[in-house]
Amino acid sequence: NNTTNSKWKKMTISLNYEQTSNNFNKFNTSGINTNGIDSYFLSYAQGLPLDEISAFEGESITQAYSEIGTYFGYANQQAFLGFESFIIEPEDIDNPSNSSYYSNVNNAINNGYYQDYYFKSRGYNSKVNANIAFQYGDNLFLGANLNLHSIDYDQSTYLLESNNTVGEGTGVYVSDIGFENNLSVLGEGVSVQLGAIAKVSDVLRLGLTYDSPTWYTITEETSQFLNTTRYEVNEFETLIIDQTLNPNIINVFQDYKIQTPSKITGSGALVFKKVGLLSFDYSIKDYSSIKFRPSNDPHFIEQNSRISNTPVSYT
């Protein structure tokens, strides 16, 4: 500042790019699980009418999966995959209003299922930061940041389950299941930071920082693939049938917004000339302020209600 009598002495402006996290990951696990993948499909199907989770006559898997997702939602799509693959069976297949189901998966490995699970992800979280800082007089320093956040994330999982057994008597028995799920997430967000440091004396420094919530807008897309091997046993023969359900549909969900918690930090330091310093920080972060929107979405109403009971963090 060239004005002789002005107390504003210095100003700095900067622009930075930071990759805040790297989401590249890959792993595989295998072993015996006491819970089979059939319980996943059963949990979605129970209570749903059969005619809301099945294809109409002459309707393709792709058409049915798309229409069910559009009119009834994600839960019905999962139940549809379970039913069409014979993993689950209605108690009364001739009743369109049937809402009770059972599993065609035979558990014969001593109360367990052999499973291979594959996980792969890629992507990053990044931040562009614009900063401006001032010095006022000799003892006060002020700063502000504007942060633009980006999310780019892809995830793929594949669960392979096998029991290689056939139950007693006639019927349908699913012995092998391969279930793939893909998720793509794109997001943009904005936040601000405000800070001040005061030189109270030659020894004492005090600081105050405010981190605003980050306001994100998130877009999610999913796709699924299911293949099974089943035994159809009757009085005369046993048929082994391999079936693939690939809807070739990308589910594009409505954009939603999420607000992360803000944080206030107070700090202090005692400076002992060239000998050293003693500093402390105290932060308050209210996790109950996390919000999902649109707030009238039934799922978000439940999530926001749970989050509202989260305690405030003091560190």
Residue locations for each model-derived region?
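Outer-membrane beta-barrel porins/channels
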Residues: 3-314
